[in-house]
């Protein structure tokens, strides 16, 4: 199936790209999500005419996302949870909880679908979490899961010590 992207799609292309994709991927994902349209002759002509508008819109979105990225950069989210004696959580810290806390911290709504967790957070410690802001731009935040505020502060001190040791070794 030949399609034209009307929104940037990670690892696929940017607005206005004409691509061949598997029929199922096009019919079941790209078209229903309004990420693409079928590449018919009238649509191709329309896209050529509107490509500058699409690029301007994408540039505007990218600038807004870069402002959000500046807010997110170096954020540390602390979650205080009850745990067993060996540090395992009763439950887990979910991408929705991370999105809610991050949205609260930066006063901008971040969707839970933009939070990329490599694995579930089920024990205390420090984790790096990726936030997908745009098809071409990701941010990283630090998530600290602890039993108490004092334990969270200990984790932060430990992390700063490790970072300063790494800098000393590289110099």
UniProtKB/Swiss-Prot annotation:
> Which GO MF terms does the UniProt record name?
rRNA binding; structural constituent of ribosome
- Keywords attached to this entry: Ribonucleoprotein, Ribosomal protein, RNA-binding, rRNA-binding
Q: Which Pfam families does its entry note?
A: Ribosomal_L9_C (PF03948), Ribosomal_L9_N (PF01281)
So which domain of life are we looking at?
A: Bacteria
**Its function?**
Binds to the 23S rRNA.
**Family under the similarity heading:** Belongs to the bacterial ribosomal protein bL9 family.
NCBIfam families, per this entry? L9
The name on file for this protein is Large ribosomal subunit protein bL9
Origin species: Rickettsia africae (strain ESF-5)
